[in-house]
Amino acid sequence: MSEKRVKEDIINHPSHYKLGNGLETIDILEAVTDNLKGPEAVLVGNVLKYICRYSKKNGLEDLKKAQWYLNRLVDKMEKGEQ
């Protein structure tokens, strides 16, 4: 008897972007950034992306990336650019 494996769809539904409740990271990104514009949407989206996937992909590296994008957003807001 052979083991049947479901091939991961790494383009449309990569496992490191799937959350335990059926949502995918893209669902959260779209909901949160829907009312944001330009660089603010990009920065917030990247913060969320790296936080959502850190435990399944690159661990501390992803948390540092999230921190980098968050720091950039904070800097822009402090300068009145957002």
Where are these regions (language model features)?
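Intrinsically disordered, low-complexity regulatory regions
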Residues: M1-Q82
